[in-house]
């Protein structure tokens, strides 16, 4: 029997050094694309997929990530008194049901994937999603929701994947693929940031994952891998042959907001959001 997927882990402990000095006092995940911070794009995507519980693996100085999703009674009372109904409505998306979001500290600095192991008490024996807020995916249907649909049919692990030029394979986790129906691929192996000439394919993994709890026991045993960090790719590879494992070519466009140059790219394609908002702003 395939367990329903209701949990998500978001690794958000990074220092955001690529965005200094902006991230000296503001968490990178609170930087905005149009009218929402990166963290809200990720949470909205997960909630659209039916995910109900969230664990932020965070670090000191990032309390604002939890505060953002808390209720601000003083602010809401002020907006109500001033009859700012549109502003009140905008705040609705920032609320989570009390008791459904928690923050845990990372143990050490072994990289973002070590953070998943730090969420093991939250995960328990349940399947869980991982969303990296650096990746914003514009799609008609939630990207992680597309993976959940595949998971509900196949069980096991499901990764969001996309084709990249061979010369860029050295920057990503790359799949060694088996059966391929054009959308869903069987995963035979995983390689983290291979030399392009040795890459088994050009299918790369993006920051959206659906995993079973089996991966945790492998994360606990791993030594540091590529980049001197514990690599989730290595732990996932050890589950191949023990649980179903698939990659899914998601529908949508992914924007990498983890670097200064790349973070500007979503602003143009997401201008539809501004077009809907600007007339109301000008006329208010």
From Swiss-Prot:
Q: Name one GO biological process term.
A: biosynthetic process
Q: Does the keyword Transferase apply?
A: yes
Q: Which GO terms describe its molecular function?
A: UTP:glucose-1-phosphate uridylyltransferase activity
Enzyme class, top EC level, equals transferase
Q: What domain of life does the native source organism fall in?
A: Bacteria
What EC number(s) has UniProt assigned to this enzyme?
A: 2.7.7.9
Which keywords label this protein?
Nucleotidyltransferase, Transferase
Q: Which Gene3D superfamilies match?
A: Spore Coat Polysaccharide Biosynthesis Protein SpsA, Chain A (3.90.550.10)
- Segments traversing the membrane: none
Is Transferase one of the keywords? yes
Which reaction(s) does its UniProt entry say it catalyses?
alpha-D-glucose 1-phosphate + UTP + H(+) = UDP-alpha-D-glucose + diphosphate
Q: Which family does it belong to?
A: Belongs to the UDPGP type 2 family.
Q: Quote the protein name from its UniProt record.
A: UTP--glucose-1-phosphate uridylyltransferase
């Amino acid at each position: 029997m395939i367990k329903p997927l209701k949990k998500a882990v978001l690794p958000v402990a990074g220092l955001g050094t690529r965005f200094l000095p902006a991230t000296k006092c503001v968490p990178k995940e609170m930087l905005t694309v149009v009218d929402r911070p990166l963290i809200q794009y990720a949470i909205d995507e997960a909630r659209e997929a039916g995910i109900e519980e969230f664990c932020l693996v965070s670090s000191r100085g990032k309390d604002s990530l939890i505060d953002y999703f808390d209720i601000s009674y003083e602010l809401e009372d002020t907006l109500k008194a001033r009859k700012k109904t549109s502003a009140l409505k905008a705040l609705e998306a920032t609320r989570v049901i009390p008791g459904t979001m928690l923050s845990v500290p990372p143990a050490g600095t072994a990289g973002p994937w070590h953070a998943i192991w730090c969420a093991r008490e939250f995960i328990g024996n349940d399947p869980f999603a991982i969303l990296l807020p650096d990746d914003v995916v514009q799609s008609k249907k939630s990207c992680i929701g597309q993976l959940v649909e595949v998971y509900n049919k196949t069980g096991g692990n499901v990764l969001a994947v996309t084709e990249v030029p061979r010369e860029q394979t050295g920057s990503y986790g790359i799949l060694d693929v088996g059966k391929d129906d054009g959308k869903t691929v069987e995963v035979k192996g995983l390689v983290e940031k291979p030399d392009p000439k040795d890459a088994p394919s050009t299918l790369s993994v993006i920051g959206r994952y659906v995993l079973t709890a089996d991966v945790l026991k492998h994360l606990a045993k791993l030594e540091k891998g590529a980049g001197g960090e514990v690599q989730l790719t290595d732990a996932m590879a050890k589950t191949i042959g023990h649980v179903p494992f698939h990659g899914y070519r998601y529908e949508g466009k992914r924007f990498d907001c983890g670097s200064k140059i790349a973070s500007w790219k979503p602003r143009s394609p997401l201008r539809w959001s501004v077009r809907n908002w600007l007339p109301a702003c000008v006329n208010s």
